[in-house]
Amino acid sequence: MRTGKGNQEEEDYGEEDFNSKREGPSSNTTVHSNRDSKENDKASAIRSKHSVTEQRRRSKINERFQILRELIPNSEQKRDTASFLLEVIDYVQYLQEKVQKYEGSYPGWSQEPTKLTPWRNNHWRVQSLGNHPVAINNGSGPGIPFPGKFEDNTVTSTPAIIAEPQIPIESDKARAITGISIESQPELDDKGLPPLQPILPMVQGEQANECPATSDGLGQSNDLVIEGGTISISSAYSHELLSSLTQALQNAGIDLSQAKLSVQIDLGKRANQGLTHEEPSSKNPLSYDTQGRDSSVEEESEHSHKRMKTL
């Protein structure tokens, strides 16, 4: 009985050893297969990333080739890449020859390689000069905006405010007086001539009383009030005004050989007080004191020097 039990135990132990030996290599193969599957997954992920980037790169290349095909005239869509690039090179060389030809005919242009940026800058400069304000010189009209060379010229123009075409206004903080004087006999002594400033209120009162229609008409027509500045009157306007004034004084019976005649134009805040004068083409630009004229013409020529005010 003991021997039978011992044999049975030995058989059971042998079967366990055989089963353990048989299960050992199968577990090793499963571990290796798991590792291989992980490595394959990593490799496939890397390949997919590379494929995505490659697809993007190829799509960009195709888009740029399509742009080139649209730029080049008479290009065939079925050509291969090499022949198409050769056609692009030929077209670029043709454009360079044209540019060199036109640059040779205009020596003032720069000899640097031509690019798109300078062409765009020149085109923008021409368009901006077309709408740029140009100052008027002496009221005659607009001058030449860009004389000389095309690229070397920088045109700068400042906006000018002009009240009248022939009377430009120069801005100044203090009021200035433009005086026009005539001396018939320079050797005469000026000691007997009184100053002009005390007679200003009398002239203001006379002009306001005797010429209401003129002051009202000019006050309605000229709405611009000049707070300060200088008006430069042209020589033709000055001579015409002076001749009309001289003629008016001679008609009044004043001897100009014994008098000094001066015309002063003062601009300022007094322009609203109705101190105006008629146009230089009128026959009577000044108003005279009738009482002084009746008393003595010579006394009026020596003591009453009229002062004109203009807007």
Swiss-Prot record:
Q: Give the top-rank taxon of the lineage listed in the UniProt record for this protein.
A: Eukaryota
SUPFAM superfamilies tied to this protein = HLH, helix-loop-helix DNA-binding domain
The recorded induction information for this protein reads: Repressed by heat treatment.
Q: What biological processes does GO assign it?
A: DNA-templated transcription
PROSITE patterns membership:
BHLH
Where in the sequence does UniProt note compositional bias of the Basic and acidic residues kind?
33-44, 51-60
**Gene Ontology molecular function, alphabetical:** DNA-binding transcription factor activity; identical protein binding; protein dimerization activity; transcription cis-regulatory region binding
* Region Disordered, residue ranges: 1-60, 271-311
- Residues of the bHLH domain: 45-95
* Keywords, ordered alphabetically: DNA-binding, Nucleus, Transcription, Transcription regulation
Q: Which InterPro entries match?
A: bHLH_dom (IPR011598), BIM1/2/3 (IPR044295), HLH_DNA-bd_sf (IPR036638)
Q: Which GO terms describe its cellular component?
A: nucleus
Tissue-level expression: Expressed constitutively in roots, leaves, stems, and flowers.
Q: Where in the cell is it found?
A: Nucleus
Q: What does this protein do?
A: Positive brassinosteroid-signaling protein.
Subunit info here reads: Homodimer. Interacts with the N-terminus of BZR2/BES1.
- Listed name of the protein: Transcription factor BIM2
Protein's organism: Arabidopsis thaliana (Mouse-ear cress)
Which gene is annotated as encoding this protein in its UniProt record? BIM2
